[in-house]
Amino acid sequence: MGFRSFLHRLTAPKFQRYVHGDQSLKMVFVINHELKMGKGKIAAQVGHAAVKATLKSGEARPELLDAWLSTGQKKICVKADDARLIEQIEQEAKQHNVLSSKIHDAGHTQIPAGSLTVLALGPDENEKLDALTGELKLF
């Protein structure tokens, strides 16, 4: 899907709201707490993850993206102790057919280049994402 098509789908009036069964949908951001990023840095990294996950979902699962966009775009941030745990969660997400998007920092400011900062999961059903991240504390 091209960028113009994606923008059109986001901004065009919806004549019919999509419903994904009886399931509520959300996107989860798993933040690497080990890096001790500042609040602004975290906000920027989560922003990158949100955009990347939304674009990926638009290509891979557009019906799920449409349902999420039309039902409030719920987003949750949780913290992981380190990059190893984030990688483990990503592998579990793949096994459960949950879309994931990793963000690695460019290294221009607070943290070393290539550091895994955030993992975005979804959008997907609450229950599927809770099974992957339900044990993590809210950020």
Stretches with model-predicted labels:
Residues 2-7, 29-30, 69-81, 94-139:
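Short basic, glycine-rich beta-strand/loop surfaces that mediate nucleic-acid
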Residues 47, 52-83, 95:
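Compact, glycine-rich, soluble single-domain proteins
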Residues 14, 56-64, 98-106:
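Short amphipathic beta-strand starts and helix->beta connectors
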Residues 22-28, 32-60:
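Glycine- and Gly-Pro-enriched alpha-helical subdomains that act as flexible
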Residues 41, 45, 81-84, 127:
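Conserved active-site and cofactor/substrate-binding residues in soluble primary-metabolism enzymes
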Residues 1-37:
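Intrinsic disorder/low-complexity detector
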Residues 84-92:
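Short amphipathic alpha-helices within nucleic acid-binding modules
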